[in-house]
Amino acid sequence: MPLEKIPAILLIVLGMHIALTAPTPPTPKSQRRFGDGPVGINWLGGGINLIKANTIATSQIQLKQLTSIKAGYWTCAVAELCIIVAGTMESDSAWSKRVVALLLPNGKHPYCIRLTPTTTLATILVVSGAVIRYWCFREMGRYFTFHITILENHKLVMTGPYSIVRHPSYAGTILMAVGQVIWYTAPGSWLREGIIYQIKLAWLLIIPVILCMFLGLANTPRRMMAEDAMLKKEFGKEWDKWAKAVPYRLFPGIH
């Protein structure tokens, strides 16, 4: 029965919403000890030197863009929930017929929106990634921002997930991105079963999601190196000791 997919849908959309919502308000420039935005890396001279990145391309996605991306996730979730509910109603229900005709223009039965082993795997990946990111939010507190910076009275956080790898929030992001690709392209998903990708208007929702995942994954290595360089510059030997104790950046024993 499609009803069993409802918990998975809610877990996916709530996990993505929480993980993509900044845990702290934007930090005033006066409280930032390093720059007012993203940080780049200058490799000249064989060393890593921090440079302000206000004039270079960066991977920072503005909060307004994240809001539109989250709206896309919620739209897909609500669409699937409506289809599932419509499928449980009497076949002569006018509301059910309208919903199915609108959201499944190819004429498929509402039961096509279902939980499968593939979407179950996707749920596990997305929820795991979201939990990791939320753990990072809680562990870092006010130091976790959606921009790379050093705050006043900044402390080096080395506990919780940061005692396992140095950049656990990015590990969570990668798990979520992989899970999303599987979730939205697997059999049983609305985008696939309803052939929604053939509707031009639907790409207003699809493109921001794809762009978010691509930019996030493509720029993760540079952001990690920038953060390591910035923290090393700020904390010196304390960071060296932590990096020696926690040598992996993303996944223990792998990277």
Protein language model regions, located:
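Membrane-anchoring alpha-helices and their flanking helix-loop junctions
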Residues: 1-158, 175-255
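Glycine-rich acyl-CoA binding loop
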Residues: 160-171
